[in-house]
Amino acid sequence: MHQTLCLNPESLKMSACSDFVEHIWKPGSCKNCFCLRSDHQLVAGPPQPRAGSLPPPPRLPPRPENCRLEDEGVNSSPYSKPTIAVKPTMMSSEASDVWTEANLSAEVSQVIWRRAPGKLPLPKQEDAPVVYLGSFRGVQKPAGPSTSPDGNSRCPPAYTMVGLHNLEPRGERNIAFHPVSFPEEKAVHKEKPSFPYQDRPSTQESFRQKLAAFAGTTSGCHQGPGPLRESLPSEDDSDQRCSPSGDSEGGEYCSILDCCPGSPVAKAASQTAGSRGRHGGRDCSPTCWEQGKCSGPAEQEKRGPSFPKECCSQGPTAHPSCLGPKKLSLTSEAAISSDGLSCGSGSGSGSGASSPFVPHLESDYCSLMKEPAPEKQQDPGCPGVTPSRCLGLTGEPQPPAHPREATQPEPIYAESTKRKKAAPVPSKSQAKIEHAAAAQGQGQVCTGNAWAQKAASGWGRDSPDPTPQVSATITVMAAHPEEDHRTIYLSSPDSAVGVQWPRGPVSQNSEVGEEETSAGQGLSSRESHAHSASESKPKERPAIPPKLSKSSPVGSPVSPSAGGPPVSPLADLSDGSSGGSSIGPQPPSQGPADPAPSCRTNGVAISDPSRCPQPAASSASEQRRPRFQAGTWSRQCRIEEEEEVEQELLSHSWGRETKNGPTDHSNSTTWHRLHPTDGSSGQNSKVGTGMSKSASFAFEFPKDRSGIETFSPPPPPPKSRHLLKMNKSSSDLEKVSQGSAESLSPSFRGVHVSFTTGSTDSLASDSRTCSDGGPSSELAHSPTNSGKKLFAPVPFPSGSTEDVSPSGPQQPPPLPQKKIVSRAASSPDGFFWTQGSPKPGTASPKLNLSHSETNVHDESHFSYSLSPGNRHHPVFSSSDPLEKAFKGSGHWLPAAGLAGNRGGCGSPGLQCKGAPSASSSQLSVSSQASTGSTQLQLHGLLSNISSKEGTYAKLGGLYTQSLARLVAKCEDLFMGGQKKELHFNENNWSLFKLTCNKPCCDSGDAIYYCATCSEDPGSTYAVKICKAPEPKTVSYCSPSVPVHFNIQQDCGHFVASVPSSMLSSPDAPKDPVPALPTHPPAQEQDCVVVITREVPHQTASDFVRDSAASHQAEPEAYERRVCFLLLQLCNGLEHLKEHGIIHRDLCLENLLLVHCTLQAGPGPAPAPAPAPAPAAAAPPCSSAAPPAGGTLSPAAGPASPEGPREKQLPRLIISNFLKAKQKPGGTPNLQQKKSQARLAPEIVSASQYRKFDEFQTGILIYELLHQPNPFEVRAQLRERDYRQEDLPPLPALSLYSPGLQQLAHLLLEADPIKRIRIGEAKRVLQCLLWGPRRELVQQPGTSEEALCGTLHNWIDMKRALMMMKFAEKAVDRRRGVELEDWLCCQYLASAEPGALLQSLKLLQLL
């Protein structure tokens, strides 16, 4: 933890004492509170608020928050949600008044996340607001807003969050709380974070109790917050007031105390305590502190009133009375509450601990980006820890592992809702903060109305909302600011990791959807998390992938790595495991390590509060994850014992992942990226091996996805009650209450804890964690958690540049750590992979997920998750690269790169986000579908083996499933972090620096410059300066469709003054523009500036112009490339049409080409930045930068058309949506739908331009083949109805020419009814590229039925060849998976004889 500070002896009481009956006593533990006795000493003196002296959270016996199994004997309440008392270091608020009160010597602002006990009358979930005790200016917010659409309603009113933000000097300040969950507050306050909650009435209670206990711990506070304490008697030892609701709710909650010497934090803490009491019944989970909610001027927004229930009873006044002492108490209380979490907020007393993830992230990702803004707090959104269940775990924020190691400071995560951050307040690790005074103003200080944390973090400019006005959430992980480890992490909703440098992509928000989908994790959490994530995303760095300990016991101490400060926080896995909140350490600073949205960043954090919480917990706990490793019983042991349970938990987690499927993927992608990031960080390498091994999951993955989804494993025995007291230094899982919840010695952080987690993600995460602080990912055991996505995607680091680059200071990702695939993993039938580490020693083989970041797929498709992207252990997975073998065969095997990448173990692209998938990534469909063991699956495959036809039929089915998984894996590989949506606003303008003075591309509507973001140095971005006058483009916005590989992604647009020199043609010399000039030369004009991820090197028009000679010299190769470009165009247009969008301006100038080479090398090479680069090829961050700086630079691309890069197929991006139209039918407006239903067909078809894009695509075929637009050459065609014969012929230069000619005629059909659709055009192009050829189908005397049989056999043969090709590429490090491989996989995975027949007829081959 931060330093163990002497607390007053009161801490010995430990608020949990009153609930001791719910705890399980373990040797060496206090018989009253069940915390380690050493913890008591640490947690003492609630009365004195010593900012710096907050003790590490006392190890309270973890209460099963979610694991009902664990609850046995642990909590009287059926479920105890982990309560997270986050005590962010005080943030110096822009408003000095907020922190003026130094009188609170212990100004420790604490964010207390607690679950309102179910018993207490809780406001509706909606009603339950999260109270954020921020800098209160004495303003009390109305409780009414507590019910906020935020999604609190979504979340069971189980948790309330008390954010002790910056407390004003006056005790009265405590009174003011703003419910985090009020949306309107959000708007006002820039989205205070709301948290997803899981429904856990008893958990709420326990959380409440913990909160009360925490409050009680601070004797100073206990008087005032008596009611509060009452409500949380179990937790509040000193104030053992039993609140009806609090009593039974002994649920562990993590208390993260950020102590800031002399900071007003203490006051905040005290307020927090009060607030806690106040919210007693509050249901809000602190998991996602939406910036709006928390970050808004905490002081301003509805503070006290927002917590009607117990909160009210406590009354703000009571709080103020004990404010000063209470703060301290709160810190103590937080420590106590941490008992529930068992992590005790890895930096129990450190302010940094306030955000489990922040600390964790910061320390973990210190190397990622030592932004000068370490002060920036992690986003409260970040802390949007995990869903309520996870809450507890996340609640125990783990101090950043590294910083923690270095110092005791607890990183703080602050969420700044408003982009207008008054001043970035360094949020340092707790210890730092403690050392520095509250004045240092943890990032949490309210700046303006937004949390100072965000402002402090300086991320203030980052706005989650695309709208400049929207505040951006900034997660500032300041761990060791003194050490120059100041890192500012933007938590991005989409990236569960949340430490990604890149702004959290919006995808996280989309992932929010995931969240929604997953077991209704809690809208508020999602929302707030999304908000905070989105806000923070811009700053998000690749966090260490949260270790998801998939739902299985988190055996591996995450802290094994030098991260010695493993934040024990999630040791609570017990809670977490049972609550699933323990998903292990989510190292990502993202938010609180919201794994759920993919996190966290990876959307996990947001999208799946439930899941997010796990990662969040994971992040926090991961930091100091040791709790599981702790203990008497290694988690492994527990894993073995509880394999089944783990499986169930896993299944739960997995199931959730599955539910979240695609969204999860994006999350998982982020996680995967994170993992590489992890690897990239130096620590990662250090921890990588050990960590990954320790993180290896021993448990068996549920045999089948559905099983995983549906059944939730019994929560592991009360292992979830790990009150890890993570000393930054010790980084041991203190009190992994799970087995023997004795405090683990710091050595534990070095210990490998094997995770029985089924999700490889966790492994990757683990790797990351190791690098960070050695926190290993935990499994989310809790069935409740099961719904959450485990964040399996965590291991996607390599794929996601965002995550990766932040992961280390830009260290090359460790890449694939050894890709260790256990035989079990590689065996076709083996569902379980052994981690490569011996740790798990579980019966099931472990896959060394950490070794291959992509090892864990969070792929929705279980099959995908077979192996980390690098090695697909499962037969299918491993066979993914099979195609490579036949790279020589036919065009359909064009790309070797893909396999190499994937095979290139480190390849980020391979990040499989389906960690759950990984668990179930079985070779066979049966493995996918069947819940039975691999033995059963294998038995089914081998049954009737004597029949050749039956065996071939089974093989065909296996190939089909394997290819489908390969498609998804390739998507993760090439999309990398791009699946996450990012949002920048004008406040982020100063973060960007041009890498070259010359534009990299001049397109039809804009000039592009390659730039880097100071917050995400590993990734490259394109700064698009629109040429059109500002009034016309001010309303510019990319289509509101999900992120797609071939659609330009708008990461934020705003009006900026741009020097006129930058608007000149790329050929004209430019004055050096080292950074986007905020103070441009005299000549400047207002232009709309768009930040995009894809850095184009030329337009299709440039490509056609530069390749005229090559077309004549090598017509076959050139026209084949044209087919690929057209195929990508069709893919993008098809995606747009699915969402009712018609582009209406398709021309060569609006089609951008981006380098899309993936390095096949095993090293960090896995990411040729081109395609992934924009997204953030995780490991490629290093490579991404080069592409950005060099290859992506304007001159480099076009200059060497025939260079090695030119041999790689470029990625085509559709841009310029100024003329785009959206079909009216796509609106949910019922009235509009009714009116549309009454329109005549000719009106509807005319208004929708149904075949508009098809027609323009036909013209593009002519232009790409160096032919003029036929309607320009033959004007008469426009004046009359023309026939195909009237169109000019295309020269027949290659075997592709006749097919392209026929396709152009079909697309230029004058009658729109006869004109083929874009989907049919896509299939025709696929048929042209990969067959079947004329010779196969033009056999005399064959009936159509016989032809269908022939085509079926042809498809099976091509699939087998593709699998072999991928298999070869997997072991050939010189070759990687290429874009052509992915496109071919898409074709073969969906091919069916009927569609092939139709395409052959259109091509007139039949």
Curated annotation (Swiss-Prot):
Mark out the compositionally biased spans (Low complexity): 546-576, 1174-1202
Keyword field: Cell junction, Cytoplasm, Nucleus, Phosphoprotein
- GO CC terms on record? cytoplasm; cytosol; focal adhesion; nucleus
PTM entry text: Phosphorylated by CSK on Tyr-253, Tyr-365, and Tyr-413; Tyr-413 is a primary site of phosphorylation.
Give start-end positions of Polar residues composition bias. 660-671, 678-695, 737-746, 754-770, 798-808
Q: Using the record's annotations, give every residue carrying the modification Phosphotyrosine.
A: 253, 365, 413
The biological process GO terms on file are: cell migration; negative regulation of neuron projection development; positive regulation of Rho protein signal transduction; regulation of cell motility; regulation of cell shape; regulation of Notch signaling pathway
- Give start and end of each Protein kinase domain: 978-1329
**Record note on what altering residue 1366 to A does:** Decreases homodimerization. Abolished interaction with PEAK1. Decreases cell migration
Composition bias, Pro residues: 1163-1173
Q: GO molecular-function annotation terms?
A: identical protein binding; protein kinase activity
Q: Give the span(s) annotated as Disordered.
A: 184-205, 217-248, 372-470, 484-854, 1163-1206
Annotated function: Catalytically inactive protein kinase that acts as a scaffold protein. Functions as an effector of the small GTPase RND2, which stimulates RhoA activity and inhibits NGF-induced neurite outgrowth. Promotes Src family kinase (SFK) signaling by regulating the subcellular localization of CSK, a negative regulator of these kinases, leading to the regulation of cell morphology and motility by a CSK-dependent mechanism. Acts as a critical coactivator of Notch signaling.
Record comment regarding domains: The dimerization region encompasses helices both from the N- and C-terminal of the protein kinase domain.
Q: How does it assemble?
A: Homodimer. Dimerization leads to the catalytic activation of CSK. Interacts (via C-terminus) with RND2. Interacts with CSK (via SH2 domain) in a Tyr-413 phosphorylation-dependent manner; this interaction potentiates kinase activity of CSK. Interacts with PEAK1. Interacts with NOTCH1 intracellular domain (N1ICD). Forms a complex with N1ICD and MAML1, in a MAML1-dependent manner.
Q: What is this protein called?
A: Inactive tyrosine-protein kinase PRAG1
Species of provenance: Homo sapiens (Human)
Q: What is the lineage of its organism?
A: Eukaryota, Metazoa, Chordata, Craniata, Vertebrata
